[in-house]
């Protein structure tokens, strides 16, 4: 994303034992030390491809470290986590951090019309037909049938698998090590290849790519059922694994990754998280060759999406070196799109229903548009401190964030006036006023609003137009929301606000949840 950027790496996780994938995680003190080193080194952007605990802002070392980075003009881009699609799983929910979900790209690898996603190893792909055998049929005497179906270690009979293609099932969860370790079992059993089939509850038509120790085809549940029907229809099932072809411009895309963590924000549902989504499925990434037997492999996760956005932030910082972290974040969020390349709403991982802002935040990132957003929602550290004061914290704890002994919480602070690029209203009682400030970072222009209100909610905006006569001019506007609360859904409902001058599009999602009756 930022081809001439200088990269500096800081180690935070000292407890990963590769290649067994037994991960304990990072200690907060190591995370904080890495951030302080980055701050001292004068980096411009921090990529944090690691999920934090959903603890209170003031009780979390990552929250404190990222706040200190923001104070020093460094924006942190962090992964929303891979605990989706369940609601309320989004991590790194700090308002001064740009959190990122993961979605697909418009590229697939296919072979003879069968779509699959695969790490292409250095060895030649065998083109002839080989016998197929399922993990269950390859079970070693005394092993559990379920374990053998999943191709778990110690469950497969080498004498039954050597020279064949082993068919393994997924455990019904999206965990990279399941797929990888199954391929290791296949390799150690002498298989010439593996077919890995995902379970239905992950999302039909959805597959991932991970590191494979043998040549591998990964199938969705639907395609897997077709394969198993074929296997059961003949006494001698055979298959071949052919080389891949690269297809671009696939529609529809993006589609949300089912693993991508979702909102609402468990720390504070008044702040929408994740903030945006970016390419995070089947990404060609650099890998340590001593572990993955190659310098490159296909990877999936919000840890892959996060660097894409960090690169965008670095490019914005290069073009606009005087912008605050909030301005850079706003530019990325307000230019993101909730539509796919068919012009339709981004679909969820099941491919049949529309995703919501709890999956994609403000939308899928648009790098070129983010360089010239027109307007930004700007903030500084005191805006974030005022936000924290709304809870309220103990003053001694607050000093860990501010290090400003003269700072005192305001007498009152309305979170609806927090100048965030997205708008969330919880415990809505039928009337609410939201205040925002927009700063002109482009040429003079007149912006007019376009509102798509959440169902059952009426929204008025004041003033009706925003006329900017010069750069850096700031204009305050208000949204006035009204609804018949007795007839309003108590579920989360969604809308949007767009300010446009015919060239720039400054979009904010609107999320409303009525107070429980």
Question: How would you label these PLM feature ranges?
Answer:
Residues 1-517:
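Loop-rich non-cytosolic ectodomains and luminal regions
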